[in-house]
Regions:
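C-terminal catalytic/acceptor-binding lobe
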Residues: 130-214
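Conserved catalytic core of nucleotide-sugar-dependent glycosyltransferases
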Residues: 57-129
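Acidic donor-binding segment of Leloir-type glycosyltransferases
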Residues: 1-26
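Short glycine/serine/threonine-enriched helix-capping/active-site loop
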Residues: 20, 75-80, 156, 163
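Short beta-strand-to-loop acidic/aromatic patch adjacent to the donor-nucleotide binding site
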Residues: 43-55
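A short, conserved beta-strand element in the Rossmann-like catalytic core
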Residues: 53-56, 82, 132, 140
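Glycine-rich, basic loop-to-helix element that forms the pyrophosphate-binding segment
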Residues: 24-40
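Preference for well-ordered, secondary-structure-rich cores of eukaryotic proteins
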Residues: 21-23, 30, 56-60, 64
């Protein structure tokens, strides 16, 4: 995470950076994000949830931070997601500016960097911790946000840069379980009652306690 932490130190100064790991045997990204938010005492404090391998641009991030304080929504400080992969990451490591590194454009990306308050995050249930290993927790979260808050996560014009990391298998029993759970989210799209029931059934995060009654 050093490249990401270095970027934040250089651009935002002495900010509170917390590294979160849930300790699950099978990596659980949704749980890591939820734990990070749950560690914030002030429900109105603006928080940046940043994957360990993703670097934002400064101006979109600052815009998202300012807006997230009052919008009641989660903000994504980008409209373009550049996956640098091995070649682009090697270029960056060698000193090439991020905006000049080779990349693959990932269409529809809704992960990497989130800007929110705890109140906004939990207002639509956070992320579903039943997603484990690779896949779908971000897409399911996006659908829940759209359905329960009547608006998609709000984007800010800009780019995020995802550095190379080892890919996880997109097959097997856990992947199939993730895909099946994602299908439930698709079926609940635009049905507020169905979505609330689906999100609230993620008891691992005690969602029923956090999700508002109406």
């Amino acid at each position: 995470m050093s490249a990401v932490e270095d970027w934040y130190r250089q651009n935002l100064g002495d900010v509170d950076i917390r590294t979160i790991d849930s300790g699950d045997e099978v990596f659980n990204l949704a749980r890591c994000r939820n734990l990070g938010i749950d560690s914030i005492a002030d429900a109105g404090e603006v928080v940046v949830i940043n994957d360990a391998d993703t670097i934002p641009q400064l101006e979109p991030l600052l815009g998202a931070i300012a807006a997230a304080a009052t919008s009641g929504l989660v903000h994504l400080p980008y409209t373009r997601y550049h996956w640098l992969g091995t070649p682009g990451t090697a270029q960056f490591t060698a000193g090439t500016p991020l905006d000049r590194c080779d990349y693959e454009l990932v269409k529809g990306a809704c992960s990497g960097v989130y800007v929110t308050t705890p109140q906004s995050w939990w207002s639509h249930g956070g992320q579903d911790e039943r997603f484990r290993g690779w896949g779908f927790e971000d897409a399911a979260w996006y659908v829940a946000h759209e359905t329960l808050l009547d608006e998609a996560p709000r984007r800010h014009e800009g780019v995020v840069y995802a550095l190379h990391h080892a890919a996880q298998a997109r097959e097997g029993d856990q992947y199939d379980a993730n895909a099946a759970l994602m299908e439930q989210y698709r079926e609940a799209r635009s049905n507020r009652d169905a979505m609330r029931q689906l999100v609230g059934s993620d008891v691992t995060a005690e969602k029923a306690r956090r999700l508002p009654a109406s």
